[in-house]
A protein has these predicted regions:
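Acidic, Ser/Thr/Pro
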Residues: 4-209
């Protein structure tokens, strides 16, 4: 009987990160109990994250439900991201940055027309997510507000005005989630200028378990 790889080699293979190229996106299944690490490998880069119930993609991540139960718009370690049916989807179990956004929708052609009329049009995170999620039965009209990892959107407490500032994430910073149900995940390396400090970089992710 031929022996298998040494345990240390197996561990390395299980935890190798996958890279999402700049201004693109992907989708994949995440089993209940599995750990998802979203990593900013170069710093100052946003990643839009969507989650859907793998058994019924009509149940999706919900910013409104999450804010209601968390009683804060600044979500970090210990907070849970809830579904449109008030069920836990993802728990944040570690967070190097502590500043993310769950207010703004994925950027799109219309975002670029509105905010960047002098820049080339790009389908943005919305288009990238729509293409990646289509094989799982998710249509464009089913795409909700994303949890924008590393996005820095301060809110003026007096006026309610939003600002989009460069992320405070540094190279190698990550946010780590545990899946509370079987999920379909959509994930991007964001395409919008203001969200990423004016440049576009990749995002890494790693699944453990």
């Amino acid at each position: 009987m031929t022996p298998g790889p040494a345990p240390s080699i197996i561990a390395v293979l299980m935890t190798e990160a996958t890279r999402i190229p700049e201004r693109s996106g992907t989708a994949f299944r995440l089993d209940k109990g599995a750990i998802l690490e979203v990593i900013d490998p170069m710093g100052v880069q946003v990643s839009d994250l969507l989650a859907f119930n793998a058994d019924d993609v009509g149940e999706a991540i919900s910013s409104g439900r999450t804010f209601d139960y968390a009683e804060t718009i600044y979500l970090t370690t210990g907070h849970v991201l809830y579904s449109s049916r008030s069920r836990p989807m993802l728990e944040i179990i570690a967070d190097d940055v502590g500043r993310h956004d769950f207010l703004l929708t994925p950027c799109s052609y219309d975002t670029f027309r509105h905010f960047y009329p002098d820049k080339p049009l790009h389908r943005g995170c919305f288009g990238n997510l729509a293409e990646a999620l289509a094989p799982y039965g998710v249509t464009e009209d089913m795409i909700p507000c994303a949890f924008n990892c590393f996005m820095n959107v301060p809110v003026n407490g007096e006026t309610g005005k939003l600002e989009v500032l460069p992320p405070i994430s540094k190279a190698g910073d990550k946010i780590v989630f545990r899946a509370a149900m079987d999920l379909v995940i959509g994930l991007t390396a964001c395409s919008a200028y203001s969200s990423n400090g004016g440049s576009f970089k990749p995002i890494d992710y790693r699944i453990v378990g």
